[in-house]
Amino acid sequence: MEKRDELYRGKAKSVFKTDDADRLILLFRNDTSAFDGKRIEQLDRKGMVNNKFNAFIMQKLEEAGVPTQFDKLLGDNECLVKKLDMIPVECVVRNYAAGSLVKRLGVEEGIKLEPSTFELFLKNDEKGDPFINESHVVAFGWGTAEQLVEMKKLSLKVNEVLSKLFDDAGLLLVDFKLEFGVFHGQIVLGDEFSPDGCRLWDKETRKKMDKDRFRQGLGDVIEAYEEVAKRLGVPL
């Protein structure tokens, strides 16, 4: 597989074309950002940890019947993925109150949500990824009603699979965001799943083991990521 021109450079990953029109290469960088890119730092080993963590999770989801864009690891910081026509919407599943939900509704952090909530946000950094609903997605042509049904179904399936996986590792899956795209007519899970895009707390101590350590200046960010990977059995 030949790596060609950079197609897109995000806050923490770069996307490259290949000699296969249906495949791309994702490069996980050490860049770490918060507050819509207003704060950016370099954290050693982060790209490697997130790349291998993502590969492990995507393979677990594939085994559970969730279609993903992941194909294979290419190295410490790179993986091969399917080229998706991305839907510009973030799907957020919450099992416990945290983050923007606490700020928006004034509820106490850590409350268990029963049932888990499902939310949609427009993927737009300039607008701060605003909270939207299903009718916005259809009315503005960001996706179809049928695609939304499938995205919600897959998001809840991901929650079912990963909540158990993390629970078995002594961790609470507090919340997470997913992005989806279309590959040859099928809705497929895209982007990545790593501690950058979810909240994970130790079951016993409620210690934060995710990107909130960076956002809140708690320190030991990569050490926490590596501890999560170790508990799950991710080979680093």
Curated annotation (Swiss-Prot):
Q: Which UniProt keywords apply?
A: ATP-binding, Ligase, Nucleotide-binding, Purine biosynthesis
Task: Provide the top EC class.
Answer: ligase
Give the metabolic or biological pathway.
Purine metabolism; IMP biosynthesis via de novo pathway; 5-amino-1-(5-phospho-D-ribosyl)imidazole-4-carboxamide from 5-amino-1-(5-phospho-D-ribosyl)imidazole-4-carboxylate: step 1/2
GO term, biological process aspect, one: cobalamin biosynthetic process
Q: Name one GO molecular function term.
A: phosphoribosylaminoimidazolesuccinocarboxamide synthase activity
For this record, the Gene Ontology CC terms, alphabetical, are:
cytosol
Q: Pfam family of this protein, just one?
A: SAICAR_synt
Quote the EC number.
Answer: 6.3.2.6
Return the similarity comment.
Belongs to the SAICAR synthetase family.
Protein name per Swiss-Prot or TrEMBL: Phosphoribosylaminoimidazole-succinocarboxamide synthase
Please name the source species.
Answer: Pseudomonas putida (strain GB-1)
Tell me the name of the encoding gene.
purC
